[in-house]
Amino acid sequence: MNTNKPVTQTYQNVGSQPAVRTEAGNKVLRNTYMLLSMTLLFSAAMAWISAANNWPYPGVMITLIGYFGLLFLTTKLRNSVWGIASIFALTGFMGVTMGPIVNAYIGAFSNGTELVMMALGGTGVVFFSMSGVALVSKRDFSWMGKGLMIGILVAFVAGLGAIFFQMPALSLAVSSMFILLMAGLILYQTQQIINGGETNYIMATITLFVSLYNLFTSMLHLLGFFAGED
């Protein structure tokens, strides 16, 4: 079963050179984590509402149109107060699409709830591990930028192909790719924030949020495959 669909995110400062860690970078990081926490809670609430009311999955095309439309709007409004409203609209929409996915796994597997919790736990472990490395490491990870951008685009296109042509093996490969790519993106983006390569906390929040979304859905897909449907 593969009801998840990876989403991609364009980001700025790809391949930019890191700067010395500054107080400005620390401030952006604090603001990013604060906004990320709020959007995750809001998205989780919307996912719960969607799941509790058994709302149907809107479909790949509607999901992608809604996501990219709200992403474009948020990018345009990123330097204004309306950018905050827009990012909540974006993450809330993604939460709504998550509800039916979670319901599908809970309904299809006798241990569906356990699979969901394992995917959540795995996502948390990857996020905190990669964030920790970015915060304490003195290594320069800016070289990862271009490779991540290309890899994400390739995986995204392959993911669409797996969905439309019903190719389970390719779908599993894409999920594995996205786990690695999103782990790398969290590492890269976090270092960009603290080194001054990313100065807009709204855009930084989107990148980290989308990374977490893709990590969770990809892990859930792999766990579901290895668990086997009842």
What would you call each of these model-derived segments?
Residues 1-230:
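A hydrophobic alpha-helical transmembrane-helix feature that marks the membrane cores
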